[in-house]
Protein backbone atom coordinates (compact mmCIF):
# COMPACT_ATOMS: atom_id res chain seq x y z
CA UNK A 1 0.00 0.00 0.00
CA UNK A 2 2.77 2.44 0.95
CA UNK A 3 4.75 1.63 -2.21
CA UNK A 4 1.67 2.17 -4.35
CA UNK A 5 0.96 5.57 -2.77
CA UNK A 6 4.62 6.53 -3.15
CA UNK A 7 4.56 5.65 -6.86
CA UNK A 8 1.35 7.63 -7.40
CA UNK A 9 2.79 10.71 -5.67
CA UNK A 10 6.03 10.50 -7.69
CA UNK A 11 4.11 10.12 -10.94
CA UNK A 12 1.89 13.06 -10.08
CA UNK A 13 4.90 15.20 -9.14
CA UNK A 14 6.69 14.43 -12.42
CA UNK A 15 3.67 15.43 -14.51
CA UNK A 16 2.94 18.66 -12.66
CA UNK A 17 6.11 19.54 -10.76
CA UNK A 18 6.53 23.03 -12.19
CA UNK A 19 3.02 24.07 -11.21
CA UNK A 20 3.50 22.68 -7.70
CA UNK A 21 6.93 24.29 -7.25
CA UNK A 22 5.80 27.67 -8.59
CA UNK A 23 2.74 27.56 -6.34
CA UNK A 24 4.92 26.77 -3.33
CA UNK A 25 7.39 29.59 -4.02
CA UNK A 26 4.48 31.98 -4.55
CA UNK A 27 3.01 31.02 -1.19
CA UNK A 28 6.36 31.45 0.60
CA UNK A 29 7.01 34.97 -0.69
CA UNK A 30 3.59 36.46 0.09
CA UNK A 31 3.74 36.98 3.86
CA UNK A 32 7.35 38.17 3.61
CA UNK A 33 6.29 40.87 1.13
CA UNK A 34 3.25 41.78 3.22
CA UNK A 35 5.28 42.03 6.40
CA UNK A 36 7.88 44.24 4.75
CA UNK A 37 5.35 46.55 3.06
CA UNK A 38 3.23 46.90 6.20
CA UNK A 39 6.29 47.61 8.33
CA UNK A 40 6.99 50.62 6.12
CA UNK A 41 3.49 52.00 6.77
CA UNK A 42 2.93 51.47 10.49
CA UNK A 43 5.38 52.87 13.00
CA UNK A 44 3.62 51.78 16.21
CA UNK A 45 5.20 48.44 17.19
CA UNK A 46 2.19 47.18 19.18
CA UNK A 47 -0.20 47.79 16.27
CA UNK A 48 2.34 46.27 13.91
CA UNK A 49 2.63 43.05 15.93
CA UNK A 50 -1.15 42.75 16.20
CA UNK A 51 -1.64 43.15 12.45
CA UNK A 52 1.15 40.66 11.70
CA UNK A 53 -0.48 38.04 13.89
CA UNK A 54 -3.88 38.63 12.27
CA UNK A 55 -2.40 38.35 8.79
CA UNK A 56 -0.61 35.12 9.61
CA UNK A 57 -3.73 33.65 11.23
CA UNK A 58 -5.59 34.17 7.95
CA UNK A 59 -2.69 32.96 5.81
CA UNK A 60 -2.69 31.31 3.22
CA UNK A 61 -5.68 33.44 2.19
CA UNK A 62 -3.37 36.44 1.72
CA UNK A 63 -2.12 35.33 -1.67
CA UNK A 64 -2.05 38.50 -3.77
CA UNK A 65 0.42 40.95 -2.22
CA UNK A 66 -0.15 43.65 -4.83
CA UNK A 67 -3.86 43.94 -4.03
CA UNK A 68 -3.24 43.88 -0.28
CA UNK A 69 -0.51 46.53 -0.47
CA UNK A 70 -2.73 48.76 -2.63
CA UNK A 71 -5.59 48.45 -0.15
CA UNK A 72 -3.30 49.10 2.81
CA UNK A 73 -1.68 52.17 1.27
CA UNK A 74 -4.76 53.63 -0.41
CA UNK A 75 -2.80 53.59 -3.66
CA UNK A 76 0.81 53.53 -4.78
CA UNK A 77 1.04 57.32 -4.60
CA UNK A 78 2.53 58.36 -1.25
CA UNK A 79 0.96 61.82 -1.44
CA UNK A 80 -2.48 60.34 -2.05
CA UNK A 81 -2.07 57.93 0.87
CA UNK A 82 -1.12 60.71 3.26
CA UNK A 83 -4.02 62.83 1.99
CA UNK A 84 -6.53 60.05 2.64
CA UNK A 85 -5.19 59.46 6.15
CA UNK A 86 -5.31 63.19 6.96
CA UNK A 87 -8.90 63.47 5.74
CA UNK A 88 -10.03 60.46 7.78
CA UNK A 89 -8.25 61.68 10.90
CA UNK A 90 -9.71 65.16 10.43
CA UNK A 91 -13.20 63.63 10.37
CA UNK A 92 -12.73 61.98 13.77
CA UNK A 93 -11.65 58.52 12.62
CA UNK A 94 -9.03 56.96 14.89
CA UNK A 95 -5.77 55.65 13.44
CA UNK A 96 -6.40 52.11 14.71
CA UNK A 97 -9.87 52.07 13.11
CA UNK A 98 -8.32 53.02 9.78
CA UNK A 99 -5.86 50.13 9.87
CA UNK A 100 -8.53 47.68 11.03
CA UNK A 101 -10.83 48.69 8.18
CA UNK A 102 -8.08 48.38 5.60
CA UNK A 103 -7.10 44.98 7.00
CA UNK A 104 -10.70 43.70 6.75
CA UNK A 105 -11.07 45.03 3.19
CA UNK A 106 -7.78 43.47 2.10
CA UNK A 107 -8.70 40.15 3.72
CA UNK A 108 -12.04 40.05 1.88
CA UNK A 109 -10.43 40.77 -1.49
CA UNK A 110 -7.42 38.50 -1.01
CA UNK A 111 -9.54 35.62 0.28
CA UNK A 112 -11.65 35.68 -2.87
CA UNK A 113 -8.60 35.90 -5.10
CA UNK A 114 -6.96 33.09 -3.16
CA UNK A 115 -9.90 30.75 -3.63
CA UNK A 116 -9.94 31.56 -7.34
CA UNK A 117 -6.20 31.01 -7.57
CA UNK A 118 -6.47 27.68 -5.79
CA UNK A 119 -9.02 26.55 -8.34
CA UNK A 120 -6.81 27.45 -11.32
CA UNK A 121 -4.01 24.90 -10.63
CA UNK A 122 -6.64 22.17 -10.39
CA UNK A 123 -7.82 22.94 -13.92
CA UNK A 124 -4.23 23.20 -15.17
CA UNK A 125 -3.49 19.79 -13.71
CA UNK A 126 -6.63 18.41 -15.32
CA UNK A 127 -5.52 19.71 -18.74
CA UNK A 128 -1.95 18.40 -18.32
CA UNK A 129 -3.05 14.95 -17.22
CA UNK A 130 -5.82 14.79 -19.80
CA UNK A 131 -8.91 16.99 -19.75
CA UNK A 132 -11.37 14.13 -19.38
CA UNK A 133 -9.40 12.35 -16.67
CA UNK A 134 -10.47 13.11 -13.11
CA UNK A 135 -7.30 13.34 -11.05
CA UNK A 136 -7.17 11.93 -7.54
CA UNK A 137 -8.04 13.45 -4.19
CA UNK A 138 -4.34 13.27 -3.26
CA UNK A 139 -3.53 15.80 -6.00
CA UNK A 140 -6.18 18.20 -4.72
CA UNK A 141 -4.91 17.82 -1.14
CA UNK A 142 -1.33 18.44 -2.28
CA UNK A 143 -2.15 21.65 -4.16
CA UNK A 144 -4.84 23.07 -1.89
CA UNK A 145 -3.49 22.16 1.53
CA UNK A 146 -0.04 20.56 1.62
CA UNK A 147 1.86 23.12 -0.47
CA UNK A 148 0.36 26.18 1.31
CA UNK A 149 0.91 24.54 4.70
CA UNK A 150 4.59 23.78 4.08
CA UNK A 151 5.05 27.20 2.50
CA UNK A 152 3.43 28.81 5.54
CA UNK A 153 5.93 27.16 7.85
CA UNK A 154 8.89 28.20 5.67
CA UNK A 155 7.68 31.79 5.24
CA UNK A 156 6.88 32.01 8.94
CA UNK A 157 10.46 31.17 9.83
CA UNK A 158 11.71 33.65 7.21
CA UNK A 159 9.52 36.41 8.66
CA UNK A 160 10.77 35.59 12.13
CA UNK A 161 14.41 35.75 11.03
CA UNK A 162 14.08 38.83 8.83
CA UNK A 163 11.65 41.06 10.71
CA UNK A 164 11.34 39.63 14.24
CA UNK A 165 8.34 38.91 16.48
CA UNK A 166 7.72 39.09 20.20
CA UNK A 167 6.77 36.21 22.54
CA UNK A 168 6.67 33.58 19.77
CA UNK A 169 3.23 34.67 18.52
CA UNK A 170 4.12 33.59 15.01
CA UNK A 171 4.36 29.88 15.83
CA UNK A 172 1.08 29.91 17.78
CA UNK A 173 -0.75 30.79 14.55
CA UNK A 174 0.36 27.48 12.98
CA UNK A 175 -1.63 25.32 15.42
CA UNK A 176 -5.02 25.67 13.65
CA UNK A 177 -3.39 24.74 10.35
CA UNK A 178 -1.83 21.63 11.88
CA UNK A 179 -5.31 20.48 12.92
CA UNK A 180 -6.84 21.47 9.59
CA UNK A 181 -4.10 19.72 7.63
CA UNK A 182 -4.67 16.52 9.62
CA UNK A 183 -8.39 16.62 8.90
CA UNK A 184 -7.75 16.90 5.15
CA UNK A 185 -6.52 13.31 4.95
CA UNK A 186 -9.81 12.05 6.36
CA UNK A 187 -11.89 14.13 3.97
CA UNK A 188 -14.54 12.32 1.93
CA UNK A 189 -15.19 15.17 -0.52
CA UNK A 190 -14.75 14.53 -4.20
CA UNK A 191 -12.31 16.57 -6.24
CA UNK A 192 -14.93 18.03 -8.55
CA UNK A 193 -16.88 19.25 -5.51
CA UNK A 194 -13.72 20.94 -4.17
CA UNK A 195 -13.25 22.64 -7.54
CA UNK A 196 -16.81 23.92 -7.69
CA UNK A 197 -16.92 25.13 -4.10
CA UNK A 198 -13.53 26.82 -4.44
CA UNK A 199 -14.42 28.68 -7.62
CA UNK A 200 -17.95 29.65 -6.57
CA UNK A 201 -16.82 30.90 -3.17
CA UNK A 202 -13.92 32.69 -4.81
CA UNK A 203 -16.17 34.50 -7.28
CA UNK A 204 -18.66 35.45 -4.58
CA UNK A 205 -16.14 36.67 -2.01
CA UNK A 206 -14.00 38.43 -4.61
CA UNK A 207 -17.08 40.26 -5.94
CA UNK A 208 -18.03 41.28 -2.40
CA UNK A 209 -14.47 42.48 -1.78
CA UNK A 210 -14.47 44.59 -4.93
CA UNK A 211 -17.78 46.16 -3.89
CA UNK A 212 -16.37 46.93 -0.43
CA UNK A 213 -13.28 48.57 -1.94
CA UNK A 214 -15.36 50.63 -4.39
CA UNK A 215 -17.68 51.81 -1.60
CA UNK A 216 -14.73 52.68 0.64
CA UNK A 217 -13.09 54.67 -2.17
CA UNK A 218 -16.35 56.58 -2.74
CA UNK A 219 -16.62 57.31 0.99
CA UNK A 220 -13.04 58.56 1.07
CA UNK A 221 -13.76 60.79 -1.92
CA UNK A 222 -16.89 62.09 -0.20
CA UNK A 223 -14.95 62.80 2.99
CA UNK A 224 -12.28 64.54 0.92
CA UNK A 225 -14.78 66.81 -0.81
CA UNK A 226 -16.48 67.72 2.46
CA UNK A 227 -13.12 68.40 4.09
CA UNK A 228 -12.07 70.66 1.20
CA UNK A 229 -15.39 72.54 1.40
CA UNK A 230 -15.00 72.99 5.16
CA UNK A 231 -11.45 74.24 4.71
CA UNK A 232 -12.65 76.70 2.09
CA UNK A 233 -15.37 78.02 4.40
CA UNK A 234 -12.95 78.37 7.30
Segments predicted by a language model, with ranges:
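Junction motif at the cytosolic side of a transmembrane helix
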Residues: 12, 164, 208-234
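Transmembrane helix boundary and interhelical loop/hinge segments in multi-pass membrane proteins
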Residues: 69-89
